[in-house]
């Protein structure tokens, strides 16, 4: 009897394929509050499974929350949040109050959603223009998106941008990297498996040895390879 494919095991939702969210510090979102407030950064924490560190902020009304850390902030630093907050590194301001060219991060699409854009380590967005009650922001991918003028954003660049420059050096470090995410690692090639484990497995060779294209309506145990592809291989030159 054949074995289940990796995607079939993932579809069942076993422990190896579920993100260990219980290890996270907590949701890194803006609080749903109105008006202007002052706050202080009381801690900077590593958030397992997330590229960027988070800061713990305590407001003047006693409310505490987490947001992605910005480059240059420090424990004890005071920040402002609200429509009339100053344009300073780490402050949370409505994007409609920011001039063009301002570098921002953790940008909301609609006020109250907690932050949708530019949340990964080292990412940022730039105010590129305004159109009516919408603000145009340019993401790191060069894509232009529209957000509400009442949406909030943090002034600055998300911290931790150089984490990709540190070499992993050994497979063990890569194991722990994926251990805190919803990723099964390592991923073995189908041609390297036994015939019982994969449709591409078996034989003393590293080739599929059969057409790798499969129908869109193929059963789950056979639906691997080039699924419903129009063509495979290199495109011939004219």
From Swiss-Prot:
Residues 198-238 are annotated as: Disordered. One of its GO terms (cellular component) is cytosolic large ribosomal subunit. Gene3D superfamilies: 2.30.30.30, Nucleic acid-binding proteins, Ribosomal protein L2, domain 3. InterPro entries: NA-bd_OB-fold, Rib_uL2_dom2, Ribosomal_uL2, Ribosomal_uL2_arc_euk, Ribosomal_uL2_C, Ribosomal_uL2_dom3, Ribosomal_uL2_RNA-bd_dom, Translation_prot_SH3-like_sf. Keywords: Ribonucleoprotein, Ribosomal protein, RNA-binding, rRNA-binding. Pfam families: Ribosomal_L2 (PF00181), Ribosomal_L2_C (PF03947). GO terms for biological process: cytoplasmic translation. Residues 206-216 have a biased composition (Polar residues). Residues 223-238 have a biased composition (Basic residues). SUPFAM superfamilies: Nucleic acid-binding proteins, Translation proteins SH3-like domain. GO terms for molecular function: rRNA binding; structural constituent of ribosome. Part of the 50S ribosomal subunit. Forms a bridge to the 30S subunit in the 70S ribosome. Belongs to the universal ribosomal protein uL2 family. One of the primary rRNA binding proteins. Required for association of the 30S and 50S subunits to form the 70S ribosome, for tRNA binding and peptide bond formation. It has been suggested to have peptidyltransferase activity; this is somewhat controversial. Makes several contacts with the 16S rRNA in the 70S ribosome. HAMAP family: Ribosomal_uL2_A (MF_01320_A). This is Large ribosomal subunit protein uL2. It comes from Sulfolobus acidocaldarius (strain ATCC 33909 / DSM 639 / JCM 8929 / NBRC 15157 / NCIMB 11770).
């Amino acid at each position: 009897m054949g074995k289940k494919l990796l995607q079939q095991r993932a579809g069942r939702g076993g422990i190896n394929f579920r993100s260990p969210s219980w290890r996270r510090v907590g949701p890194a979102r803006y609080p749903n509050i109105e008006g202007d407030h002052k706050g202080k950064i009381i801690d900077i924490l590593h958030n397992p499974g997330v590229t960027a560190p988070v800061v713990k902020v305590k407001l003047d009304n006693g409310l505490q929350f987490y947001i992605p850390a910005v480059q240059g902030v420090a424990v004890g630093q005071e920040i402002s949040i609200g429509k009339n907050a100053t344009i300073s590194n780490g402050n949370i301001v409505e994007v409609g109050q920011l001039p063009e060219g301002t570098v921002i991060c953790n940008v909301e699409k609609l006020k109250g959603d907690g932050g949708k854009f530019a949340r990964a380590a080292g990412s940022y967005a730039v105010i590129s223009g305004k159109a009516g009650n919408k603000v145009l922001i340019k993401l790191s991918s060069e894509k232009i998106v529209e957000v509400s003028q009442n949406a909030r954003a943090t002034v600055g660049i998300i911290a931790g941008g150089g984490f990709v420059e540190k070499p992993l050096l050994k497979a063990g470090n890569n194991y722990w990297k994926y251990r805190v995410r919803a990723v099964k690692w390592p991923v073995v090639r189908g041609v390297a498996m036994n015939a019982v484990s994969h449709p591409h497995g078996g034989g003393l060779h590293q080739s599929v040895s059969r057409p790798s294209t499969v129908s869109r309506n193929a059963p789950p145990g056979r639906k691997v390879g080039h699924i419903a592809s129009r063509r495979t291989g290199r495109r011939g030159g004219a």
